[in-house]
Amino acid sequence: MVEDFAGDAMTLSIAQITDLHLLVDPQAALRGCVTTPRAAAVFGNLKQRSPDLLLLSGDLSEDGSPASYERLRDWVEELGCPAIAIAGNHDQPERLTEICGRSPFMGEPVYSIQGWRIIALDSYQPKRIDGRLRGDQLDWLDQRLGEDSSPTLLMLHHPPVLIGVTKMDAIGLKDGPEFLEVIAHHQQVRLVLSGHAHQAFIQGRGLTTFLGCPATAMQFDQPELPAGWRSLELEPDGSWRSQIHWVDTDSIHFA
């Protein structure tokens, strides 16, 4: 099923956030990083920018607690735009769906939005850090891409390409080569967004660009950096622009 969403302008403004790692205790720290205030600061920044659509690319909760997903749901409702969320390896997918699987969250895996298609993929594996799409989902993706030639954005949690960081490449998308083979036959795939790496990266393969996004939680290789997110502007002709934003959280106090 394809869900249609009509925005107000020709340019589609998207915000991508990832790897929030929210905890049941909003004051608790993960690897020395108090994750909840950082995520709250990013949502405050997003409210000032009013994106048309929010993409959340996994690891939304660290502990899978109902309180963490309820907090996330409340922030998205306050933001006031539709949102597409996928699970990362730290998430509890069933709980994510139960708590966040209703408006403003959009529940279908394929969306038609202002001349673009957005397809959300599931790379989650129970009790695994690495990811896998599996053959049935790859076959499904191949079929979906074959039915519409509109410019397409794909989102998954695990990077499907090697990013040059040994520890991260070892826990990326295990069937990345098979995924790349599928999309190589569909030149309308313009963007592939991922999380998991806790850093921004960009790679190009043919007409497809692969983009990584910094975390709202800690950045693995540069822990001194603040919370980050990615903005994208998509045009109906398939062109796009993107920018990384950093949000200073030093003065943020979350209660």
Curated annotation (Swiss-Prot):
Q: What is the lineage of its organism?
A: Bacteria, Bacillati, Cyanobacteriota, Cyanophyceae, Synechococcales
This one is known as Probable cyclic nucleotide phosphodiesterase syc0937_d
In the UniProt record, does the keyword Coiled coil occur?
A: no
Q: Which GO terms describe its molecular function?
A: 3',5'-cyclic-AMP phosphodiesterase activity; metal ion binding; nucleotide binding
Required co-factor(s) are: Fe(2+)
**Which residues of this UniProt protein bind Fe cation 1?**
19, 21, 59, 198
Keywords, sorted A to Z:
Hydrolase, Iron, Metal-binding, Nucleotide-binding
User: Which Pfam family, just one, is annotated for this protein?
Assistant: Metallophos
Give the source species.
Synechococcus sp. (strain ATCC 27144 / PCC 6301 / SAUG 1402/1) (Anacystis nidulans)
Keyword Ribonucleoprotein applies: no
What does the entry comment about cofactor binding?
Binds 2 Fe(2+) ions per subunit.
Enzyme Commission designation? 3.1.4.-
Which positions does UniProt annotate for AMP binding?
A: 21, 59, 89-90, 198
Quote the InterPro entries the UniProt record gives. Calcineurin-like_PHP_ApaH, CNP_phosphodiesterase-III, Metallo-depent_PP-like
- List positions binding Fe cation 2: 59, 89, 157, 196
